[in-house]
Regions:
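Short amphipathic alpha-helices in soluble, non-transmembrane regions
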Residues: 256, 365-373
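Acidic/histidine-rich catalytic neighborhood of metal-dependent amide-processing enzymes
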Residues: 142-144, 148-228
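Midchain, well-structured core segments that form catalytic/ion-binding scaffolds
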Residues: 191, 199-363
Length: 478
């Protein structure tokens, strides 16, 4: 009986701790702040982006498929669209389609960098409802490849700077606009820009590139719009798995063919996901957004020491973005075997695309995969990859500037750090700055986000204006 009382007492104590922690896990008090409206020519911002969309700046890994004239057409258009930028800023053209604008500040102790890329991915025009390079505006929507990724922020940066310069504004410190024309093919354009910064000993205190956005229904139990600012991005590795054999006729196979061995390896990897690691970006997001969730989810996020296993199992079963925030993910994307149905291949291979949690490295991820497969006949080879980026600070003036610009533009949204699961050019800036933030200055629906790299990419015209407003607010603090 005493044991029963002890068990009941422990359970009551545990319940009390859980409920007390849940009750304390509420939105943090914030000082009330008003934001002055930002006035500028929003129609001109839309027209500028429309004209940029008409430039077919499609990048390919096979350079012979590219049209260099289209890239030069876009660059030649910039002085016309942004004349004040060309009056006050100097442009340095760097190899591999790198464009670096310099806007001198009143002082030169530190610098801010606003990034974007002006190349776009290929299109399948027959699957589009509107032509992807004509810049058609219909019912308040601009259609075209690059409207979201990322000519909207390219235009946002330059339109904001053009407006501020016309108003006689000069930043307190230097500002650079760093644009790449090879981001979509992982080209060296951004790397060349970073090397330029290193060679000229530029003290970079703030970098802003594409990344999160203002979105809804992305966090359990939260109904308000969430403005997600990436403070790190996952690493990436394309891993090749291969198995060799003597080959032969399919009529007399051995127990396991190369394809069978690969299939077994694939199943083992998919059935044994990487361990959950709640690193700083995810932990800060849970702490920020979790406080605004429903009671049940607040109880979970306030007591991950107790409910972490439940969250882990839910994420493993459902997959998706929340799962990707907490572990290294593996997606098998390619497989190759025999060229004939009745021939056992002398070799077979498959490739997985891995996105590495900040707790992992390419080396540790390969070791985990090797251990899960447990078959020396399966050879692993890293085709290409990069480790996760450093994690940027959030308790600093640089973060405050970005967060303030977001809050002023999308008033009522919940501004939160997060871990970016895609790759961007900003990953190259780790060696030159501890304050690299990934935010695409747009409010997007789930349907709109699905058009990025897909068919029918488009943007609402009012969103174009808000992108410019964000950069005006941000540059005004630099």
């Amino acid at each position: 009986m005493i044991v029963l009382y002890i068990i009941l007492a422990v359970l009551v104590l545990l319940l009390a701790v859980v409920l007390l922690r849940t009750a304390a896990f509420h939105p943090k008090a914030e000082a009330f702040r008003t934001y002055a409206p930002v006035e500028f020519d929003r129609e001109a911002a839309v027209t500028n982006l429309q004209r940029l969309i008409r430039c077919r700046t499609v990048s390919y890994t096979d350079a012979s498929k590219e049209d260099p004239a289209e890239f030069e057409k876009l660059i030649a258009l910039l002085p016309e669209l942004y004349p004040h930028v060309y009056e006050k800023c100097t442009l340095t053209r760097l190899p591999d389609r790198g464009l670096l604008f310099y806007w001198a500040g009143k002082a030169h102790d530190e610098a801010s960098v606003m990034m974007a890329h002006f190349d776009v991915v290929p299109v399948e025009e027959e699957n589009w409802k509107k032509p992807p390079f004509e810049g058609i505006i219909e019912d308040g929507v601009l259609w075209g490849r690059g409207t979201l990724d990322t000519k909207v922020t390219f235009n946002g940066v330059l339109t904001a700077a053009d407006h501020l310069i016309a108003q006689g504004f000069q930043p307190e410190q230097d500002i650079y606009f760093a644009f790449s024309g090879q981001e979509e093919i992982n080209g060296p354009g951004a790397v060349n820009i970073v090397h330029w910064f290193q060679e000229h000993n530029i003290n970079i205190q703030l970098v802003v590139d594409e990344g999160g956005a203002v979105v809804e229904d992305v966090f359990p139990g939260v109904k308000q719009p969430c403005a997600l600012i990436g403070i790190a991005e996952k690493g990436m590795m394309n891993l090749e798995y291969s198995v060799s054999s003597a080959g032969g006729h399919a009529s007399a196979p051995k127990p396991h063919t190369p394809v069978g061995a690969l299939a077994d390896a694939c199943c083992k990897v998919e059935n044994h996901p990487f361990t959950m690691h709640i690193t700083a970006p995810a932990a800060k997001m849970f702490d920020t957004l979790g406080r605004h969730s429903t009671f049940l989810y607040r109880m979970i996020f306030a007591n991950l020491w107790l409910f972490g296993g439940i969250l882990d199992n839910l994420c493993k079963k459902q997959g998706g973005e929340l799962n990707a925030l907490m572990r290294t993910t593996v997606a098998f994307t390619q497989m190759q075997g025999s060229k004939a149905s009745n021939v056992i291949p002398p070799s077979a291979s498959m490739v997985s695309n891995m996105r590495l949690n900040p707790a992992d490295t390419m080396e540790s991820a390969m070791e985990y995969i090797r251990g899960v497969i447990g078959n020396d006949a399966v050879t692993l080879r890293c085709v290409e990859g990069m480790n996760p980026s450093p994690i940027s600070e959030t308790d600093c003036p640089a973060w405050d500037k970005v967060a303030s610009a977001v809050a002023g533009t999308w008033q009522g949204s919940l501004v939160s750090p997060y871990l970016m699961v895609q790759c961007s050019d900003s990953r190259h800036y780790g060696p030159v700055s501890n304050h690299v933030y990934r935010f695409s200055a747009m409010d997007l629906t789930a349907e709109e986000r699905s058009t990025i790299h897909g068919n029918n990419e488009r943007i609402r015209t009012e969103v174009i204006g808000r992108a410019v407003e964000f950069y005006i607010r941000l540059m005004s603090q630099c």
